[in-house]
């Protein structure tokens, strides 16, 4: 049975982006244990080094995403997919052989520099899919990275529980190698290289027809990613407070954190289709408002299961935001610079992961865990107002 090219590309890219997301986040629950195994015994040093090793990948990825986006526009998206998947597979496998914590941090830094799979995938799907299916394709694709990032800690914890610490890196590396092989065999791209002098950042920005809108969408992508990750540093402590028993705290915390990722996978393709029908500007406004409101009751839950239910609902609302932003970016960006612009929006997402983790920890330390939910809600609702005045009204008038 013949499968359309855009569908085949979508399936392979979804798997690759999911595994890439897992590869970046699976280390979160095992990091303190692995650092201890590598010879660090002081608790405060373990916490500090864990934070550096986790966050450095996202900061470096934010810097390199636009660079790889530019390379994708110049040399094609498929070569970037192959480079990123093979490079990350090697870096993650080497982490399993790290002799000390400093080599581990250096390899996490290298992993951040090598990434670019998400940028190339998003650009490939945006430029190789027809307009009728673009919203659905980008909606489906957007679930991969965020689901991989959110489910990664649970997957890492389960592998560690079953096989031990080092096999987490070997199994994740093997999955990325599978992504490399499937990309090599199945992904096809019709790419015509333009024999023009490469554009610098100022020239690219000059070519963007909707500068104001591009800024709003990038900031919104940063805020929604930040909102998902503010709970990351406090989830285990909060679940412990809510639980009557101390059994399986790590697993329950992982499930509560990952519930939004599961909901995202379910909701995003359908909300991507909805944005094609009623307009992306309407979906983005409703989703932001709903997400902002759903954060408030999370501060008042009485059990981990109530928290899990609200996190699932949050994932459904935020599932409408990623595909909508990608669809709008594609709509307002010329094909020749799509990779660069997607590189900037994906960088905003990586910064959101890092910023959310830092903000959640700082707010919880200074004001208490409940205030993490109030601050996150306020940020989403303020962003919603900004989108209403700068995006929604503009598109509605047109």
Task: State where each predicted segment sits.
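Central cavity-lining transmembrane alpha-helices of secondary-active solute carriers
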Residues: 52-68, 258-269
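Paired small-residue
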Residues: 91, 102-110, 294, 305-313
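Juxtamembrane intracellular "pre-TM" segments in multi-pass secondary transporters
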Residues: 1-6, 188-218
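Cytoplasmic helix-loop-helix junction between adjacent transmembrane helices
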Residues: 107-145, 327-328
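Structural signature of the two symmetry-related core transmembrane helices
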Residues: 79-94, 173, 282-297, 377
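Symmetry-related core transmembrane helices of the 12-TM Major Facilitator Superfamily/SLC fold
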Residues: 168-184, 372-389
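Conserved MFS/SLC helix-loop-helix module at the cytosolic interface between two early adjacent transmembrane helices
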Residues: 62-99, 275-281
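Short amphipathic helix-loop junctions that connect adjacent transmembrane helices
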Residues: 30-47, 234-251
